[in-house]
Amino acid sequence: MNYLKTIGSFALLLAVAGCNPNGPDPGKGKIDPKYEGLVLNEIAAHEETQEFDTWVEVCNASDQPRELDGLGLYITDQFFKGQKIADLSGTLAPGERKVFSTADETLVTGFSSADPFTLVLGTDKDIVADSFECKADDPSLGYFASYQRLPDASGEWRLVTYSSQGKVNELFDLSKTRPTAVWAWGSHMSDLLANDGAKLKELKAKGYDHLLLNYSAFDYPTNKPLAKRLIPMCDELGIAVHAWLQAFYDGDWVSPIDDAKKAFKEEIFERIRTDAARYIEQWGVKGIHLDYIRFGGTAYKHNYTQEVNSINAVNRACREVRETCDAFEEGIVTSAALMPEANSSEYYGQVPSQMAKYIHILMPMIYRYGSYNMSDNTFKSNSNYFAERAAAGGGVSWSGIQTYDANTKGLSAEKLRRDIDLMAETNASGIVLFRYQLGTFPDVNDLWN
C-alpha cells in the first residue's frame, strides 16, 4: 500500500466533508455555543515515559451541563500537525472535570513540555472550544508540575511545580493543614510505600499532615525511584512533603564564613539557594526545611564585623531561602530546625526572633531524653520560649519532640502522647516528631482543630 498516497486521499475526503485534516485552527476556529464554558484546565506534558504520564484535564466552567460528544484533543508539535490524540464523550455537569491520560490510553500519545506545542480542544470541522500554547522559551515541567488555570477553570495559565489532577486548581495553603509533622529519612520511604502505602495512610489517618523528607530521598540515585512514587501518594492523601536540606553541614560542619578573609563564603549560600530551588522545581515539594542552619557550638569564633558574623550568616541563609521560595508564588513554606537551649546564639548563631522574620515555622528540637534530661516544666518552658520568640519575628513555632528514650528505644503511644499533650499546653502552634520508625505514633486528630 502507498501510505503517503492513502494519507493524501484521506485528507482530500476530509476536506470534501468539511473537515480540517490538520485539526481545528485556534486562530481561525469557530465557536459553537453548545461547547461554551468547556475549557482546558490543566496540562501535564511529560511526553510518554515509563515513570510519568501525559494528561489533560477538561473542565466545565459554565452553569449548564455540557456534552463532550464530537469534541477531541488535537496536538501540533515537532511530530504532529493537528493530530487528534483523544476522542471525548459523555456529559460534564457544571464544575465537573474529566482527565484524559496516557495512563489509561484515553490519550493516545504523550507530548513534551521541552518543545513548543499547541493543544486544541475542538472538532475536526474547525470548532474551537479552547486552546493552549507552549512556546519555545517557556520552562519545561518538573516531575510533578503542570500548566494550570488559576483561579480554577477561569484564570490565566501558569506553571505550577505541583499538580492537582482531577481536583480544583489552587495553590498550597498552610492554614488548611494541621500543624503536625514527622521527620523521615530517605531510607524510610520503602517502609512508607509498602503494602500500597499502608503506613503512610496510617500517618494521615492519625492526624499527621506534613512529612519532612531528608535530602537523600531526592539526591541518592537508589532513592529517586521511591521518591517519585512517594510524593504523588502524599499529594493524593493530603500530606505535604517538605525537602529537608542540610545548610552548614556536609558530613562535617561547613562554616559559611571564611575566617582568613573575614568574609562570607558565597558558594555556600549559592548551594543552599540552588538546592532549595531544585527541590521545588523538580520535585514539587510544598516546603523547604533547613537543618544544620547553625554553627556547631563555635559561633563566637566567627564574629568579625557588624556585617560578617555568625548571626548574620544564619539570618542570611534564612532570608535567601525565603526569597527563593517566595519567588515561585506557590505558597511554599519555609521551616528550620533549632537547638533547644534558650539564649544560645553565642554558640549556634541562632536568634529565633530574627530567624522568624524569614522562616514561617521554627522547629526547635526540644528532645527531653538523654543528655538534656528535661523535667516536664523545663520541657514546657523551652517550648514557650521559642513560641514567644517566633511570634515576635512574625512566625510560629512547632515543637520538635523526641520519639525515643535515652537508650534509643521507641516510646509507647501513651508516653509519646503524654509529651505531645504537654506541648499542646504551651504556646507552640504545632508539633514535629523525630523520627519515623522509632516509637508508636499516637492519634492526634483532636489537637489543633
Task: Give residue spans per PLM region.
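Intrinsically disordered, low-complexity linkers and terminal tails enriched in Ser/Thr/Pro/Gly
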Residues: 19-176
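Boundary/entry segment of secreted carbohydrate-active catalytic domains
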Residues: 173-199, 203, 336-340, 402-404, ...
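Aromatic-lined carbohydrate-recognition surfaces of secreted/lumenal glycan-active proteins
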Residues: 181-185, 242-246, 311-349, 394-405
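Active-site-adjacent "subsite" loops/lids of carbohydrate-active enzymes
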Residues: 182, 190-192, 226-232, 240-283
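Catalytic domains of carbohydrate-active enzymes, especially glycoside hydrolases
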Residues: 194-219, 282-287, 361-362, 426-430
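Active-site groove signature of glycoside hydrolases
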Residues: 212, 271-308, 432
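Substrate-binding cleft/loops of secretory-pathway carbohydrate-active enzymes
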Residues: 333-374, 408-411
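Substrate-binding cleft of secreted/luminal carbohydrate-active enzymes
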Residues: 364-379, 386, 393-449
